[in-house]
Amino acid sequence: LMHRPDVDSIVNSCDSGREGELIFRLVYQQAGCKKPFSRLWLSSMEENAIREGFARLKPSTEYDALYNAALCRERADWMVGINASRLFSCLYGQPLAVGRVMTPVLAMTVVREAAIAAFVPQKFYTVELELTSGCTASSRRISEKDAAENLLAECRKEMISTIQKVTRKEKSENPPLLYDLTALQRDANRLLGFTAQQTLDYAQSLYEKRLITYPRTDSRFLTEDMAASLPGLVADTGGAFAVEEPFPIHVQQVINGSKVNDHHALLPTKSMAKADLAALPAGERNVLRLISARLLCAVGEPYCYAETTLTTICAGEEFTAKGKVVLSEGWKTMERKMLGELLSKQKEPAVLPDVQEQRQCSVAGAELKEGQTSAPKHFTEDTLLHAMETASADSMPEGVERQGIGTPGNQSRYHRKAGAEGLSGTEGQQKDQGVAAHGQG
C-alpha cells in the first residue's frame, strides 16, 4: 500500500500514544518508504471526533520526540532483558527472566511476602465504657492484660466519668478526580473483582464501540476547550442511567490543560445516550457504569460532615469516643445512586450526644476487649497498581515529576507476564484475591 503509485502521502492512524507512534514508524522504516506522512490523533472513535481529527492532521515532526521516547523504552527493555536474563540464568543454572519493569514489581511482592512471614502479632487490650449519655468510649491500647484488668476493676468500682473535652470539627471530601486507566483498573478490581487486564479489555471494547474515549490515558483532567460541551455530556450520561435529577455542575473542577499529556481523562461519549446498554456484556456494562459514575461525581459538590471527639476521665484514665454527622452528601449522593449495590457496606458512624465539658456522666457498664496487631496485607491488583504508580515517590527530590513503574496501558501486562513465567499469581476469590510471589519468584 505504501509503495502504490497512486499513494502520494500517508496518514499515521495508529493508537494515539507513544507505542502507537513507534509501531507506525517501525513499519514505515521496514517498508523503506520515503513518502511524507502526517499524524491523525484521536481520543474518541465517534464520527464527529474522527472528522475533526482528519480536518486537523498534524505534521509528523511534532511527534518525533514521542517516537524517540518509545524507541528508548524498547531498546532499554531489550538491553536489560537479553543481558540480565542471560547473566542470571548462567549464574543460577536455570532459565530466569529479568525485565526492566517486571523484576521491580516482582521484588515488591517478595518484600511484602517476607514482611508478612516475619510478622509476629502482638496482643493488646482496651477497656470500653458504656456511658449513660448514650455513647461508648474506649481507652488507649494496653499491652499487659493485668494492667487492663486492673483498670477495668477500677472503672467498675468508680462508675462515674468526667467529660474533659469535646471538640467538633467540620471537614469535607472533595469530589474524586476523573479516571485514568490505572484508577479505573484499581476500582474495577476493588468493586468488581476484575483483573487489570480484564478491565483494559472491557475498556478497549467500549472504545471500539464508541461508548468511551481513549482508555490508555494517564491523565485525570480535561482541556479548557472541552468545558463548554461538558454540561451536555453530564446530562446525557445521567439520562442514560436514569439519574436525571438536577444537581449543581462544577465544570472547572475537572479542567486543567497543563495536566493533560497525550490524552485527556476517561469519559463516556455522547453516543452512549443512544446505545442499547442492556445489550452489552455484563463486564463492559459494569466498567461503563464506573466511568459514567465517576464523571457525575467529579463535577459534584464536596461531601461535608462534622466530626466530634469526646474525651472523658474515669479511674484516672482517658477514654475517647468519636462521632460523625453528615452535613451535606454532595458527590456521594450520585455515587450511591450509580454504584449503590457495588459499594461496600460500612458501619454507620455513631452520633455523639450533646454533652458539656466538666460534667459528670454515669458509667452504665465496662468491658474488656482483646485484639491483636495485624500483619501487612497481601497485595491485591488494586494495591499493586497503586504501588507501581507511586514507586520511589518518597525518595524523589521535591519538584521532580513522579512517574512510577510502567505505563497505564501496560502495567497489567507485567503482572500477567510474571504469572505466565510462574513467578507470581493470585490467591483467593474474586475481590479478595491477593497477589503473591510463586516458585522462582
Language model feature labels by segment:
Residues 1-392, 396-423, 428-433, 440:
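Toprim catalytic domain recognition across nucleic-acid enzymes
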